[in-house]
Structure formats: C-alpha cells, structure tokens
C-alpha cells in the first residue's frame, strides 16, 4: 500500500517549516478546520492580511495523532419523535449493532451523529411534530480521545454544532450517500467526500477568493498575495499520487464485495457546490446504470469508502445506516466479512434482520452484554453490542438490548402502565400493545423454546 500522508498534516508541516506571513498561516489553519471558508472566516483572514498581523488560530492537531472513541449517546429530549431519556452505550473496541424495522426511529439516532460529525449529506433534525409545544433539542455524546478519561459534549443540534472537533473524524454512510455516489450523468460520476487530500484544493480556492476580496478593497495590496512558497506544496503531484493509490485500493475493495473485477478508472476531481467528487469511467462504453445492478452500485460506493479509510489508515469511528439495502445475501456475507476485518469502532443501524444475524452469529464474533466491563470482554474475537430499536404509537427509538425484548420485558411495561396515576386511555393502548407482544414472546419462549429457523449460509 502506498505511503499516503494526510493533506491536513502536509499543510501543518508547511506552516512550520516555511517563513510565511501570518495571514497565510491563518488561511492554512482555517482551511484545515473548515475546508471551504465561510464569508465570515474569509473576512477575518483578509483583516489579518491588510493589517499585516499574526495568525490568531492555534495550530490544529495532526491527523492520526489522536483516536476518537464514542462511548455513549444520550437523547434527553426534542429530536424528531425519539423517546425522551434514551441512551445507546457503544462498544468501544468493536461493533455496535442497532436493528429495527422501518419507522422504528433508528435513523433518528443516525441523524444526530450525522449532524455532529458533519456528514457529506445534511439530513435536517426537526423537533417532535407530535407535540403542540415541542421541547428544545437536548443530546449528550460521551467520548474519549486517545484513551483519556471520558468527556461529555452537550449538543442542542443547531447549525453551529455541525462538523465540530473531534467528531468531524467520524466516517458516515447511509443509503442517501450511495445514491449520491452513483448518479448517472454525462461523465458517469459518483460522489465521495474524500477527507484525505482535498484540503489542498480548498486552500487553492480560498486563496483565489481572498485575492478577489482584497482586489475589491485595496488593489495595491494584491501583489503581496503572490506567495512563491506555495509552489513547495506540489499540489498536483501530491494529488496524482493519491488518485493512483486510491484507484488500486478501490479495485481491490470492490472485488472483495462483488467477487469479480470491474474495470473502473478514477480520472479526476471536480467541485460541485464546493464539494469534491471523483469522475469515474468504465472501460466499456456503457452507462454505470447499464453495467451495474442497484446492489452493485451500492457496492461501488462502499468500496470507495473502505478504500479511502484503508489508504488513510484511519482508525476513527465508522457509522453506517442501512448499508446493505439492495444487496443479495452473498454480497451481504462478504460485506460482513469485510466489516469484521476493520480495526475501527463501527456503529451499524439496519432493518435487515438477516444481516443482523449474520453479524451476531459469525464465527469470529462474540456478543457481549452492554453491562459487561472491559475487563470481562476478554475474547480474541470481534466484540459486539446489539440492540433492538422499536416504536409504539408516537414514540420512536425505544432501545432494548438484543435478546432482552422478551415476555418479562413487555410485562414490566404493562405493569408500569397499569400503575400510572391517573390512568389515561393512552396508557391502556400502550399496555394492550405490550401485552400482545408478551403473549407472542411467551409462545416463542415456552412452546418453541426460542428456536428459529434460518436458511443456512457460509460463515
């Protein structure tokens, strides 16, 4: 595998070793932090340039020097119709699986992580529309960095809290991402947010915008923006090396998923709405949609995702929402095998019970209780926490540990409903729902002894 250095680190090293002015150092720091600069940030850099001041921002942390681990997500109130005071304890050293039917509310939790982590596709968070006076959004995320003590971040889910450190290191993927990655157009393109090398292109764009701004304010200062030191970055050469390495890894990852070689060539990078996308060409003169099935197009987007993670040697969390839509069972099995090879902390939301059982029953997986301590999780196999996500009436995102949604669990909810004072009609409806589930579970537990038939598949 090629030795690829993250472009954020290249920019940091550039600011250290070169005697550059304060405004350029500030421009590099803000590009690392924001990518394509906001108008406010661009104005602040421009002010430093005009005043010939020093950089204001602190030097960012190098990528790869810190590892983020998510410990717990707590939803207190206010996001969509998610039940209040719900929490998900993540498996820090393995996989966290959350399985629930469509409409159960599991994607609400993904959207929280997508918002905080700054996912490529913005999926808005709304207050609970079932309430006349919706509560403010309250979310907490517990995490560690480099194994340090647990820290907590309280989030109200507004726009200013999108893509903030250290959560911008999370890799996020869902079905909407796949639809964006594989889209039929004139050049057979699909879109992947590449976190490895586009900082250099953002810097070039931000510098051009800064020149335009300075030119509108004081043209006589524009010549001072010609920075010969930038030539040392060799942006085009660095990017060419990255694309070649990515193409090799991409083809290998694709073959692992669909079990056959596709002649796919990564040509170049484009920018649409300030977001980078790869242009992809098939060797044969057909459109992508005529060559690949819907499931295989999904595989292409997943393969690119895995290729870049591998190329960057990224060990930060990966969060996937329904990644196996449209995939047949053989491809799902290969996808499971690939997930189990990754060293990252992985969080998976899915409504596919076949996929969930493949993960939980794989030979090299050990399912642990969420109450188990790290000292108890001694197996050399991949560790996994599993949850069931379900809904009742207008309550979404109810969480129970997988396998614990038994008759006793449902009867305990019935008991709580019957003990509520005052007892209202809504309590009766919820109690009736859970009583029916309790009876169904009792039949499974006492008559069928929890035996379930699954079609055999290779492990």
Model-derived features with residue positions:
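Extended helical coiled-coil dimerization/tether regions that scaffold
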Residues: 32-80, 86-89, 130, 208-291, ...
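Conserved P-loop NTP-binding catalytic core
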Residues: 46-51, 111-163, 215-223
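GG-anchored amphipathic helix commonly corresponding to the ABC/SMC/Rad50 NBD signature/C-loop
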Residues: 112-115, 294-317
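Conserved D-loop/post-Walker B switch-helix segment of ABC ATPase nucleotide-binding domains
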Residues: 315, 327-334
């Amino acid at each position: 595998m090629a030795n690829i250095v993250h472009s954020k680190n290249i920019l940091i090293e550039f600011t250290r070793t070169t005697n550059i002015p304060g405004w350029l150092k500030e421009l590099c720091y803000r590009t690392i932090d924001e990518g394509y600069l906001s108008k406010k940030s661009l104005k602040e850099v421009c002010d430093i340039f005009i005043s010939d001041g020093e950089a204001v921002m602190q030097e960012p942390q190098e990528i790869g020097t810190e590892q983020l681990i998510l410990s717990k997500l707590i939803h207190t109130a206010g996001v969509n119709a998610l039940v209040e005071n719900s929490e998900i304890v993540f498996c820090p050293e393995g996989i966290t699986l959350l399985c629930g039917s469509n409409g159960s509310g599991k994607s609400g939790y993904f959207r929280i992580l997508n918002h905080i982590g700054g996912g490529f596709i913005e999926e808005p968070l709304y207050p609970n529309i079932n309430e006349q006076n919706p509560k403010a959004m309250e979310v907490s995320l517990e995490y560690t960095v480099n194994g340090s003590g647990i820290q907590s971040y309280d989030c109200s889910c507004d726009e200013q809290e999108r893509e903030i450190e250290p959560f911008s290191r999370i890799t996020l993927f869902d079905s909407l991402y796949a639809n964006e990655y594989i889209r039929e157009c004139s050049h057979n393109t699909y879109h992947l947010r590449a976190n490895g090398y586009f900082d250099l292109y953002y810097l070039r764009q931000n510098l051009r915008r800064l020149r335009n701004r300075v030119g509108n304010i004081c043209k006589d200062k524009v010549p001072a923006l010609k920075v010969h030191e930038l030539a040392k970055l060799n942006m085009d050469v660095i990017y060419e090396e990255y694309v070649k390495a990515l193409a090799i890894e991409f083809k290998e990852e694709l073959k692992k998923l669909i079990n056959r070689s596709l002649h796919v060539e990564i040509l170049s990078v484009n920018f649409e709405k300030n977001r980078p996308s790869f242009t992809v060409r098939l060797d044969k003169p057909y459109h992508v949609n005529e060559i690949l099935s819907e499931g295989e197009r999904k595989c292409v987007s997943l393969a690119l995702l895995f290729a870049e993670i591998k190329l960057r040697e990224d060990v930060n969390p990966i969060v996937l929402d329904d990644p196996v839509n449209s995939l047949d069972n053989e491809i799902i099995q290969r996808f499971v095998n690939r997930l189990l090879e990754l060293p990252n902390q992985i969080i998976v939301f899915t409504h596919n019970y076949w996929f969930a059982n493949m993960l939980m029953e794989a030979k090299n997986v050990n399912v642990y209780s969420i109450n188990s301590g790290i000292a108890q999780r001694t197996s050399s196999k991949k560790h996994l926490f599993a949850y069931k996500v379900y809904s009742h009436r207008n309550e979404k995102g109810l969480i129970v540990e997988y396998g614990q949604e038994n008759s006793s669990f449902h009867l305990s909810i019935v008991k709580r409903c019957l003990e509520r004072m005052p007892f209202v009609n809504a309590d009766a409806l919820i109690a009736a729902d859970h009583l029916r589930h309790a009876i169904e579970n009792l039949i499974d537990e006492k008559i069928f002894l929890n035996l379930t038939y699954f079609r055999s598949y290779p492990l």
